[in-house]
Amino acid sequence: MTNIRKTHPLIKIINHSFIDLPTPSNISAWWNFGSLLGICLIIQIVTGLFLAMHYTSDTSTAFSSVTHICRDVNYGWLIRYLHANGASMFFICLFIHIGRGIYYGSYLYSETWNIGIILLFTTMATAFMGYVLPWGQMSFWGATVITNLLSAIPYIGTNLVEWIWGGFSVDKATLTRFFAFHFILPFIIAALAMVHLLFLHETGSNNPLGLISDSDKIPFHPYYTIKDLLGLCLLILLLLLLVLFSPDLLGDPSNYTPANPLSTPPHIKPEWYFLFAYAILRSIPNKLGGVLALVASILILAIFPLLHTAKQRSMTFRPLSQCLFWILVADLITLTWIGGQPVEHPFIIIGQLASILYFIIILILMPITSMIENKMLKW
C-alpha cells in the first residue's frame, strides 16, 4: 500500500509543499523568514480572535474594552501584548525577508515577488487599521492624519475621504468599519500567502549563489523543518522577552489617553514600522507630492526586476553592490529615526537628504554599479 502522504488528495499537497519539497542544499538562515512570517500570521490570527471576543468597536466603549481585556480577562494582558508586539515581530521578519530578496536577486521570480508586494501592502493596511482600534489619542489622530492624505487626490479626494470615514470626521462609523476590515484582511493575507507559495514552488527556491541548483537538491523534511524550528524558537524567545519584560517599549504613551478630537498630541506619529515611509512623506513640503513619494517608496519594489542589470543574480560576489545595499539599509534606519522626530531643524534636512538618497540608490546607483561590475568581470 502506497503511503497516504503521497496518495491522499489534500495531504499530497501538504507533502509536496513542506515534506518532499526539493530544496537547494545551501540556503542560509536568511531563508528562514518566510516560515517565520507564516508563524507570525498564525499568532496574530489566534490572539486577534481572542481579543475580538472581548473587544467592542464603538467609540464610547472601545478604549474601556481594551482596559477590560488587560485587567479582567484571564491572561488578557498577555493576549493583548502578544498581539501588539507580534505585529512588530511580523514587520521585522517582513523587512528582513524583503531585504534577503533584494540581496540575493529573488525578485527575478517576478510572480512570487509581485504577490509579495501585494502582501506587503495588505499587511501594512491591516496593521494601520489595527492601530486605530484601541481608540487612544494616537489611534484617533493617526487615523485622521493618514486617511486625510487621500484628500490630496485631485477632484475625488475630499469625497473619497468622507466616504472612508462614513461622515465628516473619524467617528463611530470609521471605527466599526476598520474593525471589520482588520478582522477580514488577515484571512486574505493567508490566502495570498498560499498563492505566494504556489508561485514559488513553480520555480523552486533561489539560493545564496544565485545559481540553478537542480543538480543539488535535498528534501525539505527533516533538514529544513528542523532549521525552521530553531528560527521559530528564537522568534518566540524574542517575542516573549518583549511581551513579558517591556511590552510598551515600541508603543506610544499617548495611546493610554482616550481619544479626544478636541486636543491634538504634540507629535503625531505611526508605529515604528511605518516611520521610514512617514519620514519620506513629511520630507516633501507638498501634500500630493508627499503622498506620491510615500506610495512610490513601497511601489519601487515592483521595478526591481527591471533595474537588474547585473550578469550575476545574487550580490554574493558583487562587493560594490553589497556596499550600496548596506548603505540603503543604513538609510532606511536613518529614515525610521527621523520619522519619530519632531519637524524641526536639523531633522527636516536630514530626512530630505535620506529620502533623496533612498530613491537615488535604488533607481540610479544600483543599476550603474551592476554595469561597472559587469565590466570588471571582463578584466
UniProtKB/Swiss-Prot annotation:
SUPFAM superfamilies: a domain/subunit of cytochrome bc1 complex (Ubiquinol-cytochrome c reductase) (SSF81648), Transmembrane di-heme cytochromes (SSF81342)
InterPro entries documented for this protein: Cyt_b/b6_C, Cyt_b/b6_C_sf, Cyt_b/b6_N, Cytb/b6-like_sf, Cytochrome_b, Cytochrome_b_C_euk/bac, Cytochrome_b_N_euk/bac, Di-haem_cyt_TM
Chain residues that bind a ubiquinone: 201
Positions contributing to heme b b562 binding: 83, 182
Keyword Plastid: no
Residues annotated as transmembrane: 33-53, 77-98, 113-133, 178-198, 226-246, 288-308, 320-340, 347-367
Residues the entry annotates as binding heme b b566: 97, 196
Major subcellular site: mitochondrion
GO molecular function: metal ion binding; ubiquinol-cytochrome-c reductase activity
Cofactor(s) of this protein: heme b
Disulphide bond pairs: none
Stated family: Belongs to the cytochrome b family.
Functional summary from the UniProt entry: Component of the ubiquinol-cytochrome c reductase complex (complex III or cytochrome b-c1 complex) that is part of the mitochondrial respiratory chain. The b-c1 complex mediates electron transfer from ubiquinol to cytochrome c. Contributes to the generation of a proton gradient across the mitochondrial membrane that is then used for ATP synthesis.
Assembly, per entry: The cytochrome bc1 complex contains 11 subunits: 3 respiratory subunits (MT-CYB, CYC1 and UQCRFS1), 2 core proteins (UQCRC1 and UQCRC2) and 6 low-molecular weight proteins (UQCRH/QCR6, UQCRB/QCR7, UQCRQ/QCR8, UQCR10/QCR9, UQCR11/QCR10 and a cleavage product of UQCRFS1). This cytochrome bc1 complex then forms a dimer.
Protein name: Cytochrome b
Species per Swiss-Prot/TrEMBL record: Orycteropus afer
Gene, per the UniProt record: MT-CYB
